[in-house]
């Protein structure tokens, strides 16, 4: 994840005291397949889907970007335009941590990702899994595809968004 960039650089021998001057932003991304807009199929969310998505959406920053309907997601079907796959193209699920005074101070004293995420709380960062969950509800990708690429049950991630 993006906060893990700082401990990894320190582990590689970069001096923690210069990270603040050397970095402006840390970003992590995973590419997910984009649902084919010609053949995707709407389906209601089940209790199992809610069990996965609800913790991600509970405290999500920028709620205004969520679709009005939070009870529907989309599945791949397959057609001539997508070669029968149900997917056509890719899109990134991202998370970005800006280097600011709080992050710089945190990195100088600890290399704990939990502490870095706590220091970044004021930035209202949408975690990669949360960005993907929004894309699932918008019909951009499927929950199956998102869970293939992003760990939706990551303990640190779930703890830091709670």
What is each residue range found by the language model?
Residues 1-162:
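Short, flexible helix-loop junctions that flank or precede catalytic/ligand sites
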């Amino acid at each position: 994840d993006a906060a893990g960039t700082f401990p990894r650089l320190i582990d590689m021998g970069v001096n923690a005291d210069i990270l603040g001057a050397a970095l402006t932003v840390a970003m992590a991304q995973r590419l997910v397949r984009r649902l084919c807009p010609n053949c995707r199929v709407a389906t209601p969310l089940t209790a199992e889907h809610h069990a996965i998505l609800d913790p991600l959406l509970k405290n999500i920053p920028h709620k205004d970007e969520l679709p009005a309907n939070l009870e529907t997601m989309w599945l791949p079907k397959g057609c001539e335009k997508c070669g029968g796959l149900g997917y056509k193209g890719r899109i990134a699920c991202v998370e970005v941590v800006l280097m600011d005074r709080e992050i710089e101070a945190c990195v100088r004293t600890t290399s704990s990702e939990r502490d870095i995420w706590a220091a970044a709380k004021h930035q209202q960062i949408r975690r990669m899994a949360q960005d993907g969950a929004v894309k699932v509800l918008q019909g951009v990708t499927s929950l199956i595809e998102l869970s293939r690429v992003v760990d939706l049950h990551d303990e640190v991630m779930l703890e830091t968004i709670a």
